[in-house]
């Protein structure tokens, strides 16, 4: 029952206070709480917000700088890529030119070697022909010189008479 009497006492006291106060007119507690709020707001605005804003501004500046560096790096990369592509294109053209020149030089070298080989063959054949002609002429002279004597020996063998002495005396 103690609980019920405490509740009744609290309700009656609240009713008495409610009759004397007007909710449209603020009382002293409101002004005290408002003053504390304004002091806390001033302290936070003076000591907490400026360092946070400074850090945020520095962060924004770093982000902007990083973005600018990124754009500059992308532009440099694109320029380097273009230079690389141009250099590669030029190198391909130059290598193609050098390869074609090497092929032409190789064909010229092969043709020159073929001409030299043909000249060597012709000169070798000419030298061999001249040598064979000289040997043939020498053999022919030798055979002509010996042909008379051989025919006499052959005739004397066939006839059985020595013809060598009579031909030589004539």
From Swiss-Prot:
Main location: membrane
Coiled coil: none
Pfam families linked: ATP-synt_B
Compartment list: Cell membrane
Keyword Membrane: yes
GO molecular function: proton-transporting ATP synthase activity, rotational mechanism; proton-transporting ATPase activity, rotational mechanism
One GO cellular component, as annotated: plasma membrane
Residue ranges of the TM segments: 30-50
Keywords on record: ATP synthesis, Cell membrane, CF(0), Hydrogen ion transport, Ion transport, Membrane, Transmembrane, Transmembrane helix, Transport
UniProt membrane topology term: Single-pass membrane protein
Source superkingdom: Bacteria
UniProt entry tagged with the keyword Metal-binding: no
Quaternary context: F-type ATPases have 2 components, F(1) - the catalytic core - and F(0) - the membrane proton channel. F(1) has five subunits: alpha(3), beta(3), gamma(1), delta(1), epsilon(1). F(0) has three main subunits: a(1), b(2) and c(10-14). The alpha and beta chains form an alternating ring which encloses part of the gamma chain. F(1) is attached to F(0) by a central stalk formed by the gamma and epsilon chains, while a peripheral stalk is formed by the delta and b chains.
Alphabetized HAMAP family for the sequence: ATP_synth_b_bprime (MF_01398)
Function: F(1)F(0) ATP synthase produces ATP from ADP in the presence of a proton or sodium gradient. F-type ATPases consist of two structural domains, F(1) containing the extramembraneous catalytic core and F(0) containing the membrane proton channel, linked together by a central stalk and a peripheral stalk. During catalysis, ATP synthesis in the catalytic domain of F(1) is coupled via a rotary mechanism of the central stalk subunits to proton translocation.
Assigned protein family: Belongs to the ATPase B chain family.
Protein known as: ATP synthase subunit b
Source organism (scientific name): Mycobacterium leprae (strain TN)
